[in-house]
A protein has these predicted regions:
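Membrane-interfacial amphipathic helices and adjacent loop/beta segments
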Residues: 34, 39-45
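Active-site-adjacent pocket-lining segments in enzyme domains
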Residues: 3-6, 12, 26-36, 53-54, ...
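Short gly/ser/thr-rich secondary-structure transition/capping motifs
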Residues: 45-53
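Hydrophobic residues within alpha-helices
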Residues: 19-20, 87
Length: 184
């Protein structure tokens, strides 16, 4: 299965970060949680999470996807990290999957990855992005770029990442009762 890195910055959105990690691990992928500047990262609702590693010491080998959860100011911390910007550009050029949800597309914008791409984000965040084409969809896929609009999009966002990594998510969706959400 694939190797995925999910980056966490202080005051991240817990649903977007933790549910994405959970779903990708359930799908059989190896998911590394990597904190910016700290081994313990606290989310916007005061949930503290111990990371697998920190950005400064993480070993970058055989990575298939990079994922950025949103939340503010967590997404701005991601955007403002020069080393992370370098890695986003590098892995995009390698043809790897890059995914961001909620406010985190501002980091993709700073890295120049939204140019000529369709994307979605939390409503209003698009006003700070002058690249690409904002769609407002729940989840948007443009090549190897995957974006989600916010907390309610997290499950679909994570399933979409898993599918882009080659996983058939139909049994996982059924087992997690996700399909029942779509039935009225």
């Amino acid at each position: 299965m694939a190797n995925v890195v999910v980056f966490f910055a202080q005051v991240f959105e817990e649903i977007e970060g933790l549910a994405t990690v959970d779903i990708l691990r359930r799908a059989g992928h190896t998911v590394h949680t990597v904190g910016l500047g700290s081994e313990v990262i606290t989310g916007s609702h005061q949930i503290s999470v111990k990371m697998d590693d920190v950005l400064d010491t993480f070993y970058w080998a055989d990575i298939d996807a990079l994922v950025l959860p949103g939340g503010l100011p967590g997404a701005t911390h991601l955007r403002d990290d020069d080393f992370l910007m370098k890695k986003l550009k590098e892995y995009s050029k390698k043809g790897k999957i890059i995914a961001a949800i909620c406010a985190a597309p501002i980091a993709l914008h700073r890295a120049g990855l939204l140019k000529d791409k369709k994307y979605t984000c939390y409503p209003g965040v698009e006003k700070d992005i002058n690249q690409g084409s904002y769609t407002g969809h729940l989840v948007e896929v443009d090549g190897k770029l995957i974006t989600g609009c916010g907390p309610a999009a997290t499950f679909e966002f994570a399933y979409t990442i898993a599918e882009a990594l080659g996983t058939d998510t139909s049994a996982l969706r059924e087992g997690m009762q996700y399909n029942k959400l779509l039935k009225k």
